[in-house]
Amino acid sequence: MAQKINPLGFRLGTTQSHHSIWFAQPKDYSDGLQEDQKIRDCIQNYIQKNMQISSDSGVEGIARIEIRKRIDLIQVKIYMGFPKLLIEDGTRRIEELQRIVQKEINSVNRKINITITKITKPYGDPNILAEFIAGQLNNRVSFRKAIQKAIELAEQADTKGIRVQIGGRINGGEIARVLWMKEGRVPLQTIRAKIDYCVYTVRTIHGLLGIKIWIFRED
């Protein structure tokens, strides 16, 4: 069997960059990683809890969360496709989220600064597309229709290629299987090719389904 490497780690330092940017002493490194995970989980839980599906977008997805740390400051930049939830009340939601994160990580000497960046073409991001597919599957839409619609949305976002894979008890089948659809080019072995990738798990009435998406942007 082929040994498949993570496309993001394979391109780290060329077309992909780190999502956590800070330095620490070796003995403190694990604490810093756990703190980053707490921040990301806290933000995602807050947005999921307060999420209101808007009629124009159908999803309020987080593309990625970047964390930069200084001695007295933690800067968190959230890249979102549809940030209506966090910006519709001015700065109130963001200030509330900052307080929740600060309490979660028990940060007394460091200030939390959260900023929102809107993605111009949200459906060109695999995380947002995966969330869209998960929403369609939970609404009992056929998985083939859900994947086809996701591919159409990705093509409208000027992507050069996309591959979508779903694994699990599809349509309630007794045996788990893996199905995928592909459109355009997805050159996984070319390091200079800018490829985005995500893994997403969705819980359905038949059990868990795993969604994997590869998107080829440009050479």
Swiss-Prot record:
Subcellular location field: Plastid, Chloroplast
Keywords: Chloroplast, Plastid, Ribonucleoprotein, Ribosomal protein, RNA-binding, rRNA-binding
GO biological process, one term: translation
Domain KH type-2 residue range list: 43-120
Coiled coil: none
Main location: plastid
Protein name: Small ribosomal subunit protein uS3c
Species this chain originates from: Oenothera elata subsp. hookeri (Hooker's evening primrose)
